[in-house]
Structure formats: structure tokens, C-alpha cells
Regions:
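Positively charged, low-complexity terminal tracts
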Residues: 1-285
Length: 285
């Protein structure tokens, strides 16, 4: 049975003064309350999903004006009046059986149905209208801010607007050493563009492309937003960061890999255009 949410509360749980779990207490439409827990990886999936649904709500607001605005306000007021209170033990002694292992959305025009798998192997089905998404984002954000865990907050903020699909060592083009980062197809479908990205570094004999990546993002290619994103990735992606710490990063390059937004590209469909882009670009350096 699919449940509808009439109220939500969030509380961040810390361990050794660092963020550990996000407690989420949900009130159903029949006023029954349940508390679940999200680790960082699942919480990131939830935030990315809610950001996408909130963006769709903004689009509908632009199309439908005051009527849709009133609908959003009414929904947020209802949620605000039905915030369930935590019991002290729910935050101090989390029930591991209610740890969320994964979330998988099924998309509809104005809502998504969230299939939630728990540690105890129970499966929940939650309907989340798009007009609730912004409220849920704010609830999670407020709980995170209360932790004062600046390191985790910076980490979260730096990885919400892209997905790293592949990191590639391009120092030896005769053998592409790569690392694949797997993401569920639903998550990939939330990002519009596949980009091949190259990083060139200063060497004694001149400039050379030493690393690359294939990412998905909603940042329009060749914009300041995309350029800043690519530079940020160089500072946070482990393989890239190691090179940046040893060598001076001179230039970054990007190129769209043509594909439908919902298409999940194969290894060859990612590596081949990245390799060809690298050969073309290296000639210009």
C-alpha cells in the first residue's frame, strides 16, 4: 500500500562530532508516525531527487501562475502544521532495522512514488507530490546546518550538481586506465548532458593532457557554470586531486557526448568519444 505524507520532521545524528545519520520522522495521512534513517549516500540520492521534483514544480508555477502558487503554499502550510515530534530515544538510539538501504522513484507527471528498501528487508511505498519537494529539501537542510559539520556540508554542496561516471588516466593512451562509478538509471536520468572532460597539466617538456572524466550534469556546456564545475571536480575527485596536488593544472576542456537524457551509455560509448576528444585536443596544445 502506498502511503501519503502529511507531515515530516528531520534530525541529524552525529558520531564523534561528525554527521552520521539523518533521522526522518513521517506522519501518514492517518496520523500514524514512523521514523527512518538515511546514511549520507542515500540522503544525497534523496536530495538530488527532491531538487529535480522541486524544479519541475517551479516550471509548473511559471506556467500556471497564482493557482499553482496557492496550491504550493497550502501544501507547505499543511506540512508545517503536522510536523511530528521526535522521541529522545529515536535520535539517541536509532533502530538499525529502519535504516534505509535504497530508494527508487517511479515518476509521474506531478509526483513520484518512492520505493524504499529498509535494513530489515521491508519495502515501503511513499507518494511524494512535487509541491512537497521544496519543503522536504528545507527540512533536510535545516537539520544538516544544525550539525555545524562544515566539512560534510561542503562535501554535500560540491557533489549535488553532477554525476561522475568515469575517471580516466590519460597519461598513457595505449592503455586507458579508468575507474567506473555506478549510478542507478533513474539517477542518471535526472541529469541532461553527458560531457567528456579533459584536464591538461604543465610538464617540463610542455603541456599535456593527463586525465579525463565522463560526467552527467544539467549545467549548459561551455558556460561559466560548467567551467567552474569542471574545475571543482579536479579538486574533489580522488584521482584528479592527486595529480593537481603534484602538477599545475593549466587548462580544462569539455565536449558534449550526444545521447538522450534517459540513455545509459555503455563503457565504449563513453571511452571512445573521450579518447578521440583527447587526441584532437592534444594536437592543439
Amino acid at each position: 500500500m502506498t502511503k501519503k505524507i502529511s507531515g515530516i520532521n528531520t534530525g541529524a545524528i552525529k558520531f564523534n562530532d561528525k554527521f552520521c545519520l539523518m533521522a526522518v520522522k513521517i506522519k501518514d495521512e492517518d496520523s500514524t508516525c514512523h521514523t527512518y534513517y538515511m546514511q549520507l549516500s542515500v540522503m544525497l540520492d534523496f536530495i538530488i531527487l527532491m531538487r529535480d521534483r522541486a524544479h519541475k514544480a517551479v516550471k509548473k508555477l511559471q506556467e500556471n501562475g497564482e493557482i499553482y502558487k496557492a496550491k504550493i503554499i497550502a501544501e507547505h502550510e499543511k506540512l508545517a502544521m503536522n510536523i511530528p515530534a521526535f522521541e529522545e530515544e529515536e535520535l539517541q538510539q536509532p533502530n538499525q532495522a529502519n535504516l534505509i538501504i535504497s530508494i527508487t522513484p517511479k515518476f509521474a507527471d506531478e509526483h513520484c512514488t518512492l520505493i524504499v528498501v529498509l535494513q530489515n528487508e521491508h519495502i515501503l511505498s511513499l507518494t511524494i507530490p512535487d509541491i512537497q519537494a521544496e519543503f522536504f529539501i528545507l527540512a533536510v537542510q535545516q537539520a544538516l546546518n544544525a550539525t555545524n559539520d562544515t566539512e560534510t556540508l561542503k562535501q554535500i554542496a560540491s557533489i549535488l550538481d553532477f554525476l561522475m561516471l568515469y575517471f580516466v588516466d590519460l597519461s598513457d593512451l595505449s592503455y586507458l586506465n579508468y575507474k567506473e562509478i555506478n549510478h542507478e538509471p533513474w539517477k542518471q536520468s535526472l541529469f541532461a548532458q553527458h560531457l567528456a572532460v579533459l584536464y591538461s597539466f604543465e610538464k617540463e617538456e610542455g603541456e599535456e593532457i593527463l586525465a579525463g572524466a565522463v560526467i552527467k550534469t544539467n549545467a549548459p556546456p561551455d558556460t561559466e557554470e560548467a567551467k567552474n564545475l569542471i574545475k571543482r571536480i579536479a579538486l574533489i575527485a580522488p584521482g584528479l586531486r592527486e595529480i593537481v596536488e603534484k602538477r599545475h593544472l593549466t587548462q580544462t576542456f569539455m565536449k558534449v557526448i550526444p545521447a538522450d537524457q534517459t540513455q545509459v551509455l555503455t563503457l565504449d560509448e563513453c571511452m571512445r568519444p573521450l579518447y578521440e576528444f583527447c587526441l584532437e585536443t592534444q594536437k592543439t596544445l
